[in-house]
């Protein structure tokens, strides 16, 4: 362990330090000691807890490991040395008082990385203490460590700056994770990590310590403040921890005669145990031996409550797989194909990673969320914390308020950002709803009304309807499309597994569905695939093969042979449909711009979609972009319309809009679309909504996420010159993947990298189980939580995910596919 930590700085000097995911065992308890302030007695509590643990009768921990990651004022002040010095003496007293077995304690204390300003350097301390008893000998160990130590007795961020020893957050986290993962031989091990200062005191980089240690999410022991004002600081610290997703196992504080403990016991009842310590002597000459003896019952009670907390936590985690199989009904899941032991138990999330509990091993393991939690997630760990804080504020300020005829700041600000971002230069109105499918239904209603007005189906200012019974509206859409699971949205998509009689017996498919040309990467080049329905005799290799996707998106292709073929095909299909369906009207075009998601992660030729939009606008057919999946930097730009080079009349957004943390959707529209609903009658208004329209929490989250994504000070992936994301997936690795013999195609764009495996017959398509073994290996051995679309596997990150992280995950997939060969 010591050698590992000494070499850690070599391996953990950048964000790539988290490359090797540490499995943290829950076979033994581990807690973090936080303080409501500095000087509240965190180290006294740590020492008392350690001594109580070592003195516990069997079964008791054979080893107690104490870690002080950050120490200032060193070596005059050393909390690890205090624990090392005091715990053995306290154990002797407790043993004399309680009897029991003879004990042999092996204790050590060491500082790993002292600042260059620390002089003289302290030596490692080792001691062996024997305590007599009436029974056999118990072997105990106390391992105390200080990781980073600075000389000046100031906040770590100041000490690091002044003494020239900066430490990155990832370095601290890496070391803590390795310490937690270390198992010291046989027997139970308790681990106690003591933080520095208060809950929100800065670490060496300036990151608050409650944020710095959040990745480990150790249950907290909160040392409260018994002084005047301590009630406020204790509760503030408690709520700060809760807001960041920590569990607080216990609160403990000194009785200073101000009844702080009585108030906290009352306020926190049924939430968390509160333990009270006797007053700490103020005489600096007092060695606190008598105080520790007097406090032994409080520390024993603290130890018992923490043990109970840990046992309840593990018991619940162990039961969740089995219970989920009998209580839950998962979407898009055939339960008979999911063994109980394959259910992923998610303890928490931190940035792009799940903390998954492995029931068999009883460990917590970070898993990269390669599904971006079903395409919604955008936050890194910093944005996650910001969203939690802002949403808490919105919930406390607004709760929920109804929206029609009302306005509140989160909704108004969100609308301003939407119109100035994804809706810039074309949209003027924002219609809020709850999710993507609902946003699509609203968009269809908007488009149909506009079409009816433009084509004389609705006449005069009263919106009288001509020949209502004989008018049938259909959509123009693409095969392979997917627009949601509500009935109206399903009618606007082509027949598929999602719309079959088994899933939607009412489905009729109200549209003309065209076969789209697609683009994919194979053998290091971008290739155009044309469906049989599109004639392509006129096309040469320069029309169907490209050196990169950049060429595919180039607008100079508008005058190419491919453009002529597309225009002819689109015009012919629309004309033929109009001639054969006199009473039916193509009243809207609806497309997923650039990428079809649920249909298999296909990249539709942007030239085809651009010309399709142009033709529909020429025919006064309203155009809907379904950007529920593609919007807000999913494809490397804020809106996929930037890639297409054209604007819709209506567009739908959700998922990434709120950072994925809470459902909210918006349908944006042009002013002419809005005008189609205006009159003196309420019956002509858009009568569609839900109880939580524009709910303040969702709008607040969207305001934060939308601004965060595009700000280079918060998102280092933004290329300011082009206002695009930097390339997140290593192009050389993508090309290597595309050249593997078992890979049919690769699509790499923005935050998405999709890989279709070569498969035939029933091994291909949505129902395929072809990728099951690969997915299992990625989850269980590579710590990547992936979920396939049949024989298509994909990795998806957030707009803020580092390039290093993307490269690591993609390299793991590459290695697996090589072995699969």
From Swiss-Prot:
Q: Which SUPFAM superfamilies match?
A: P-loop containing nucleoside triphosphate hydrolases, PLP-dependent transferases
- Which keywords, in A-to-Z order, does the entry hold? Aminotransferase, ATP-binding, Biotin biosynthesis, Ligase, Magnesium, Metal-binding, Mitochondrion, Multifunctional enzyme, Nucleotide-binding, Pyridoxal phosphate, S-adenosyl-L-methionine, Transferase, Transit peptide
UniProt main location, coarse: mitochondrion
In terms of Pfam families, this protein maps to: Aminotran_3
For this chain's UniProt record, which GO biological process terms are given? biotin biosynthetic process
Q: Where is this site: Participates in the substrate recognition with KAPA and in a stacking interaction with the adenine ring of SAM?
A: 332
Please give the Gene Ontology molecular function terms for this protein: adenosylmethionine-8-amino-7-oxononanoate transaminase activity; ATP binding; dethiobiotin synthase activity; magnesium ion binding; protein homodimerization activity; pyridoxal phosphate binding
Q: Where is this region: Dethiobiotin synthetase?
A: 28-283
Q: Which family does it belong to?
A: In the N-terminal section; belongs to the dethiobiotin synthetase family. In the C-terminal section; belongs to the class-III pyridoxal-phosphate-dependent aminotransferase family. BioA subfamily.
Under what name is this protein listed? Bifunctional dethiobiotin synthetase/7,8-diamino-pelargonic acid aminotransferase, mitochondrial
Task: List the source organism.
Answer: Oryza sativa subsp. japonica
């Amino acid at each position: 362990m010591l050698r590992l930590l000494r070499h850690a700085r070599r391996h953990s000097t950048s964000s790539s330090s988290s490359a090797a995911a540490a499995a943290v065992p829950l076979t033994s308890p581990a807690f973090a000691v936080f303080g409501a302030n500095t000087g509240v007695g965190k180290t006294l509590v740590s020492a008392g807890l350690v001594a109580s643990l070592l003195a516990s009768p069997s079964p008791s921990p054979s080893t107690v490991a104490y870690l002080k990651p950050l120490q200032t004022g060193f070596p005059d002040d050393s909390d690890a040395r205090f624990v090392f010095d005091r715990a053995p003496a306290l154990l002797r007293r407790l043993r004399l008082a309680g009897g029991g077995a003879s004990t042999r304690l092996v204790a050590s204390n060491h500082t790993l990385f002292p600042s260059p300003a620390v002089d003289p350097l302290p030596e490692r301390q080792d001691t062996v203490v024997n305590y007599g008893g009436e029974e056999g000998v118990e072997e105990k160990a106390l391992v105390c460590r200080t990781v980073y130590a600075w000389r000046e007795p100031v906040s770590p961020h100041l000490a690091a700056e002044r003494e020239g020893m900066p430490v990155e957050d990832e370095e601290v986290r890496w070391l803590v994770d390795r310490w937690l993962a270390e198992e010291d031989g046989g027997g139970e091990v308790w681990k106690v990590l003591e933080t520095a200062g208060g809950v929100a005191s800065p670490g060496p980089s300036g990151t608050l310590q409650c944020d710095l240690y959040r990745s480990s999410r150790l249950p907290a022991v909160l040392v409260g403040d018994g002084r005047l004002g301590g009630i406020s600081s204790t509760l503030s610290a408690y709520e700060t921890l809760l807001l960041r997703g920590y569990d607080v196992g216990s609160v403990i504080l000194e009785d200073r005669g101000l009844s702080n403990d009585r108030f906290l016991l009352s306020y926190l009842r049924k939430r968390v145990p509160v333990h009270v310590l006797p007053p700490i002597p103020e005489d600096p000459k007092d060695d606190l031996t008598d105080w520790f003896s007097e406090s032994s019952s409080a520390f024993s009670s603290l130890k018992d409550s923490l043990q109970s907390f840990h046992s309840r936590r593990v018991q619940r985690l162990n039961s969740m797989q089995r219970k989920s199989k009998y209580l839950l009904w998962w979407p898009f899941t055939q339960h008979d194909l999911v063994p109980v032991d394959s259910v992923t138990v998610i303890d928490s999330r931190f940035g792009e990673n799940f903390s998954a509990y492995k029931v068999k091993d009883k460990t917590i393991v970070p898993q990269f969320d390669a599904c971006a939690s079903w395409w919604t997630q955008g936050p890194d760990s910093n944005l996650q914390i910001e969203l939690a804080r802002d949403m808490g504020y919105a919930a406390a300020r607004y709760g929920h308020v109804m929206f029609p005829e009302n306005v509140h700041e989160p909704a108004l600000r969100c609308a301003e950002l939407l119109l100035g971002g994804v809706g810039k230069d074309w949209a003027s109105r924002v219609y809020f709803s709850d999710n993507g499918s609902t946003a699509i239904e609203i968009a269809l209603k908007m488009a149909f009304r506009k079409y009816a007005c433009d084509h004389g189906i609705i006449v005069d200012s009263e919106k009288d309807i001509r020949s209502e019974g004989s008018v049938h509206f259909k959509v123009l859409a693409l095969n392979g499309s997917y627009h949601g699971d509500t009935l109206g949205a399903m009618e606007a998509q082509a027949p598929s597994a999602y719309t079959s009689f088994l899933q939607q017996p009412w489905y009729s498919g109200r549209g003309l569905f065209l076969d789209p040309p697609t683009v994919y990467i194979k053998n290091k080049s971008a290739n155009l695939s044309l469906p049989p329905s599109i004639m392509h005799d006129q096309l040469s290799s320069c029309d169907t093969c490209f050196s990169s996707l950049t060429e595919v998106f180039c607008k100079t292709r508008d005058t190419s042979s491919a453009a002529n073929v597309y225009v002819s095909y689109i015009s012919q299909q629309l004309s033929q449909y109009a001639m054969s369906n006199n009473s039916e009207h193509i009243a809207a075009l609806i497309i997923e711009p650039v990428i079809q998601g649920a249909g298999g992660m296909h990249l539709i030729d942007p030239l085809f979609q651009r010309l399709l939009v142009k033709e529909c606008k020429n025919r006064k057919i309203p155009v809907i972009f379904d950007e529920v999946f593609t919007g807000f930097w999913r494809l490397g730009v804020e809106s996929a319309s930037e890639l297409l080079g054209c604007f819709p009349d209506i567009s739908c957004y959700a998922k990434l809009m709120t950072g994925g943390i809470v459902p909210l959707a918006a349908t944006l529209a042009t002013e002419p679309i809005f005008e189609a609903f205006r009159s003196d009658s309420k019956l002509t208004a858009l009568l569609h909504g839900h109880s939580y329209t524009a709910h303040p929490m969702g709008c607040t989250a969207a305001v934060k996420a939308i601004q965060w994504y595009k700000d280079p000070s918060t998102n280092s992936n933004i290329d300011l010159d082009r206002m695009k994301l930097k390339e997140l997936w290593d192009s050389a690795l993508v090309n290597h993947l595309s050249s593997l013999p078992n890979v049919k195609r690769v699509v790499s764009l923005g935050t998405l990298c999709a890989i279709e495996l070569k498969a035939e017959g029933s091994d291909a398509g949505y129902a395929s189980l072809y990728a099951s073994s690969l997915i299992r290996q990625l989850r269980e051995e590579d710590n990547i939580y992936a979920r396939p679309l049949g024989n298509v596997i994909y990795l998806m990150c957030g707009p803020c995910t580092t390039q290093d992280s993307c490269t690591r995950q993609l390299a793991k997939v590459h290695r697996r596919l090589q072995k699969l060969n």
